[in-house]
């Protein structure tokens, strides 16, 4: 179990998948991300895309803090069940949960005309995801993101430096113990 830290649903508990399939983002890190995006005004009314959603905690934290809508993408069936449960418990209707491999789902979103739709994109891929696969995912995000969109990637602190695809511009990287939050922004 984990909880939402701030905003409308602050203090509400969320289920997390059992086992080691997912690695829920720590409350401290979700709070830091939420605070950073709120401070820049990026969350108010934002459309959020949460890639590798796991329990949905990261995206739901942002929804709680002022985002207007959330699309959560996850491929693991147990995690999908958990994120759907968490959405149901919070009684939010502005959430769409999509099942499947992230790269495949991004292509489907682009094909259905979801271009320039998302104001904030968060990605918490498995720490073992090859850099080439992450680069492919980030490149696929570009046509789906709105001008000025924030893109935030959670990575292990031992990961190679993140290479942002053009035109995403690196803003900063913050370290929290064994975790890095890498912030980028589209022009």
Walk through the language-model features, giving the residues of each.
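Class I S-adenosyl-L-methionine-dependent methyltransferase catalytic core
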Residues: 1-187
């Amino acid at each position: 179990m984990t909880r939402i830290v701030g905003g409308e649903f602050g203090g509400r508990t969320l289920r997390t998948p059992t086992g080691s399939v997912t690695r829920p983002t720590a409350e401290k890190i979700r709070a830091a991300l939420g605070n950073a995006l709120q401070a820049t005004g990026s969350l108010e009314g934002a459309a959020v895309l949460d890639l590798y959603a796991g329990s949905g905690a990261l995206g739901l934290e942002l929804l709680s803090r002022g985002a207007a809508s959330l699309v959560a993408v996850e491929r693991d069936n147990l995690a999908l069940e958990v994120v759907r449960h968490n959405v149901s418990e919070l009684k939010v209707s502005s959430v769409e949960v999509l099942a499947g491999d992230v790269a495949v789902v991004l292509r489907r979103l682009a094909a259905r005309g979801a271009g320039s739709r998302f104001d904030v994109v968060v990605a918490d891929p498995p720490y073992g995801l090859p850099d080439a696969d992450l680069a492919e995912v980030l490149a696929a995000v570009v046509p789906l993101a709105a001008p000025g969109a924030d893109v935030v990637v959670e990575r292990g602190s031992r990961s190679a430096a993140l290479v942002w695809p053009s035109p995403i511009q690196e803003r900063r990287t913050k370290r929290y113990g064994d975790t890095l939050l890498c912030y980028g922004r589209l022009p």
